[in-house]
Amino acid sequence: LPSKAVEYRLAREVETISSWLDDIGESGSVLDVGCGAGAWVEIFANRFQSVVGVERSPQMVAAAQERVAHLPNARVYQGDGRQDLPEGPFDFIFLGGLMMYLGDADVVELLQALKSRLSEGGVIILRESTVRKGVLALKGEYQVIYRSVNVYRQLCEQAGITEVEPRGNSGYASMAIAEEFVRIRRKWLSFLPKESLLLGSLTWAVLRAAAPVSFWALPQILNRLHIPWPKLQNHFFRLRPSS
């Protein structure tokens, strides 16, 4: 898929949580745990007073530091998101897809550690890939745990966080649908090149042009027929720890 697809996804994601970000206020201090290449650090630095990103991968840290080098209120350093957290306090802590790599006990422990680093009235926002029911644990080369919204609620409750507000991530869903169509094209039109920027761009352009059907109506119809498609979902969760 073309870079425009990633830009579209990210723009839709920001739109999804925009009201939550507005509630924090421009003077807010932000911690991004597992910040990757710094896309969200850059977004937050353009909205808030100060942003700190922590990332384990040295390659990702270098990419993130380069990305936010022009922003004096943003800082990224290398560290383990579970062991090398700054003390804070922070008005807003963001985790963009870290929990799915942790077991349940580690999720609860990390949430408790993050909760202790919030300012009064501060919030935690998670962005996690999800399944519709229960848990799907993948083993092998790529080990990950996909949890349902209800399972995340239960883990938050174990960490002492009872106010949990989920929001579906339509930007992620659009990308997942596009990737499914690419897989279908490769399977049924195998005579075409599997890796083709032109074909990827054409696929994305057609899906975007038919967005009311491809990104909304089709998944709704299939879900009503009890056909879970796309298989994975993604949700944002706003967590408000009680005082």
Show where each model-derived region lies.
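Class I (Rossmann-like) S-adenosyl-L-methionine-dependent methyltransferase catalytic domain
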Residues: L1-G28, G36-L85, L102-E109, V123-S243
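Conserved beta-strand/loop positions that form the S-adenosyl-L-methionine
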Residues: V33
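Short acidic/histidine-rich motifs immediately flanking catalytic phosphotransfer sites
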Residues: P89
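A conserved beta-strand element that flanks and buttresses the S-adenosyl-L-methionine
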Residues: F94
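A short glycine-rich, Lys/Arg-flanked "PGG" loop and its adjoining helix->strand segment in the class I
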Residues: V108-E120
